[in-house]
Amino acid sequence: MAIQHKKGGGHRGRGSKTGRSRGRKFETSRLKDVREDESSGEEEDVDVQPAEDMNDSEGTDVSSESGLDEPPKENSYSTLLKLLNTDAKSNEPARKKRKIKANEPDANLVEVSIPTADDIEQMDEVADTEASASEDENMDDEGLPGEDYAEDIGTDGRNDMFELHFGNPDETELSQKIQACSKAWKSTKADLIDGLYSVVSMPDVEGNSSAIPEACWSVRLLTYRQLKQKLARNTVSFDRLNSCLTPYIFGYHDTFFCSRTTQNSAKLRDLYCLHALNHVLKTRDRVIKNSAILSREDNGDVELRDQGFTRPKVLIILPTRQACVRVINSFTKIYPMEQQENKKRFMDSFSAADSDEWAHKPDDFKELFGGNDDDMFRLGLKFTRKSLKFFSKFYSSDIILASPLGLRTAIEKEGGKKNENDFLSSIEMVIVDHADALIMQNWDHVEYIFSNLNLQPKEAHGCDFSRVRQWYLDGHGKFLRQTLVFSAFNTPELNALYNTQMQNVFGKAKIMSKYEGAMLNLRLPISVKQTFSRFDSASPLKDPEARFQYFTRTVLASLARGWTESSSRKKSGGTLIFIPSYLDFVRVRNHFANSSQTENISFGLISEYTSVRDSSRARSHFMNGRHSVLLYTERAHHFRRYNIRGVTNIVMYGLPDNPIFWGDLIEYLGSAAGGTATPTVRVLFSKWDALKLERIAGTARVRSMLLEKGGDTFTFV
């Protein structure tokens, strides 16, 4: 199957060159006749193009043998429980509880228990005592774990979510949960911190609680519940956000976090990198420990199932090569390695310096496109006791990092006769970071990758089936896989992923924000009239047609009355028509080119496929008055962030997904503040735009705007 690549490595948002076509020439723009020189106001932008070629995941494989690191000798978590129980029996005041209420009554709203300062101090004292023990004391002469390793995997395994989830899940309970996944899930909602709230869902099985996990307020407490000690040595301290997310992530819940920002992205990255490393090291230690046990057994009666079909366990999906570099930096910060093979090759092909020409760009743009913004890559990482190998073969890798396009090209082979997806058959953790950016690339690639996860392999690849976990053999790998998705906002595509692909039997959590509304945070020297017009739409499939009919019959008809052949720019002003979808953009463009309704309107256009030169010319003509109307797509703004001048009116054919874009577009009106025309904004929306509308108008207003029966027009000044 041919790949529809909407966004490629070195040409962000560009389209292919067009040749001459037969018959009537298609009219893509219309200019007013003026005497000024055509190039007088033209603006040229320079688009930085990454020239790095894709590096495949090929490389020389090395031995998979690795050493072990040993946990402390004593059962520290039991000691901690005894300490807390002793405190509860004392005469000291009981732990404080704070009930957090939502704006509206909710029967499922729960109480969140916040540890006091004394509680946290006591936890840390216990942790400090245990942290002084050396892991090497529990290693035997061969570098294998000593008898005290049983603490991690044996007697206290009930306290370790890794063991409960992947080690020894109850087969009867697991079967009941898998059957319940196809039915309705029960959910619990609760407020968290800083305007965040969570919805935790669990398969509806008797005795299966959907209670909100208690926050982990101490990294040391996490260490002795879930974390390998060697990772805790370099772990950053927890802030309030990490404390709230840790129980979901380290509890192996599927987690969809919808409030990623440039301020919290680094800490989120450190958190999921810590979790991924912890999972890989625990998996490796269990396999080597069991191999040592089997080597000492004379008979074959011992059955130890601790593996999948193939070695890769963690898949991290990222938008750019530079994002991959940041993840690697987090890995090496948390888990410093004595040897890093092929590190120079990795840095040469993945890392690049930021462009000085983007100094004026917003922070979210620089975070996404700074450095090497190539979106065609894939990389295998292999961990041993003392080394990290870059560019390892996928079947020898522990962690795979890739862009959606890069991984899809690895799965698909020429001719499409056979897909190479066996290396994804035993993935136990999928991390999708900056998911909102992946939507702007090509979300079809992400959906394709998820459709190829946890399938039965077509070849053995040297697998020892006597050690493959039973639920892998039964084809239930997807029900125990943990999926973590981090996005700046929620979209229908991400909701569909959450509902269809995140089927973890241990539950899932969606963490969202309450929005004040982007329309309230404008930085303009003048007041702007913002009018929201609601139109009726029977279904999402019929929404594009209903939107187009409303636009042409109502909005465009009223605007066209001011656009005549003799009308001046001062009277009508420059109108920017913002169109989120490229398919809608093509339809509106064709209408402007061929309809008698717009035959007297001079217009230009900028889409993600418009070249930099043509975009600069269109902006220049619009600023100088040769274009009365400029058609502009959301993906063009996402990839270019143009500063468009001469805008006095804005018509939004649809709301932008990214609320940051609302402020960018409205601030265009500030460049024309000295004109005689009064700036206006007209927005079209339907009930299917609820997620977008909430981010723009605010959580408190969205319900009334969608359900109000007294009128379909809402004006804000």
Swiss-Prot record:
Compositionally biased intervals (Basic and acidic residues): 24-38
Cellular compartment(s): Nucleus, Nucleolus
UniProt GO cellular component terms: nucleolus; small-subunit processome
Stretches assigned to coiled coil: none
UniProt keyword list: Nucleus, Ribonucleoprotein, Ribosome biogenesis, rRNA processing
GO-annotated biological processes: maturation of SSU-rRNA from tricistronic rRNA transcript (SSU-rRNA, 5.8S rRNA, LSU-rRNA)
Domain of life: Eukaryota
Pfam families named among the record's database cross-references: Utp25_C, UTP25_NTPase-like
Acidic residues bias (residue ranges): 118-147
Region (Disordered): 1-147
UniProt biased composition (Basic residues): 1-23
GO molecular function terms listed in the Swiss-Prot or TrEMBL record: rRNA binding; U3 snoRNA binding
Main location, first listed in the record: nucleus
Quaternary assembly: Component of the ribosomal small subunit (SSU) processome composed of at least 40 protein subunits and snoRNA U3.
Function: DEAD-box RNA helicase-like protein required for pre-18S rRNA processing, specifically at sites A0, A1, and A2.
Similarity comment: family membership: Belongs to the UTP25 family.
Descriptive protein name: U3 small nucleolar RNA-associated protein 25
